[in-house]
């Protein structure tokens, strides 16, 4: 899980979602997981 000021899609499987006001990237590749913080 990477915490970044701005989250971006890395590959075509990445999806940007909002959970409880936190922007996250979920992907089939675990290295692509990101969280905005």
From Swiss-Prot:
Signal peptide: none annotated. One of its GO terms (cellular component) is ribosome. Pfam families: Ribosomal_L36. GO terms for molecular function: structural constituent of ribosome. It comes from the Bacteria. One of its GO terms (biological process) is translation. Keywords: Ribonucleoprotein, Ribosomal protein. PANTHER family: 50S RIBOSOMAL PROTEIN L36, CHLOROPLASTIC, LARGE RIBOSOMAL SUBUNIT PROTEIN BL36C. Belongs to the bacterial ribosomal protein bL36 family. This is Large ribosomal subunit protein bL36. It comes from Laribacter hongkongensis (strain HLHK9). The gene is rpmJ.
